[in-house]
């Protein structure tokens, strides 16, 4: 298939974003950010829906052979197992996903957990600013699936 044929099918030129994934990954992995102290973390809970939730699924697979218990929540509530040794990673590319916003509210009420949010903005960014929750604003590319490497490598960088 040549580019002309591809562009007739891929009218939004998603292939250009996918072609740039290695550069996007490198940019976010090498970005200077505040690191999280993991020495006392024995559980990580990822929360996100759709394409945002897939990032948590990937981390669950990556960490499956470690001693860290990993949960991926695609719903509204923080698991009761969360405690002071838990890192909660909330991911919403849009920043407006209802389930993830409610999960964030639930996690914020559980003050023992270490909490960090990754979003491109929206209501979630505003909530984090208002409640003084640590968050990283990540660029959104075209769609959640196109934004996958920017979110994945931003989280790997903490």
Please state what every model-predicted region is.
Residues 1-29:
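Cofactor-/ligand-binding subdomain signature composed of acidic, glycine-rich
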Residues 39-158:
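Glycine-rich phosphate-binding loops that contact phosphosugars or nucleotide phosphates
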């Amino acid at each position: 298939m040549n580019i002309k044929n591809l562009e007739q099918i891929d009218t939004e030129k998603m292939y250009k974003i996918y072609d740039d994934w290695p550069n996007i990954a490198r940019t976010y992995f090498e970005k200077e950010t505040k690191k999280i102290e993991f020495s006392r973390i024995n559980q990580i809970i990822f929360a996100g829906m759709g394409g945002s939730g897939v990032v948590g699924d990937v981390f669950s697979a990556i960490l499956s052979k470690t001693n860290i218990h990993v949960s991926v929540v695609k719903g509204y509530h923080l698991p009761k197992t969360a405690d002071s040794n838990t890192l909660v990673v909330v991911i919403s590319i849009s920043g407006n996903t209802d389930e993830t916003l409610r999960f964030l509210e639930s996690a914020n009420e559980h003050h023992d957990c270490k909490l960090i949010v990754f979003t491109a903005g929206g209501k979630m960014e505003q909530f984090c600013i208002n409640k003084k929750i640590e968050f990283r604003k990540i660029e959104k590319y075209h769609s959640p699936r196109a934004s996958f490497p920017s979110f994945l490598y931003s989280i790997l960088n903490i």
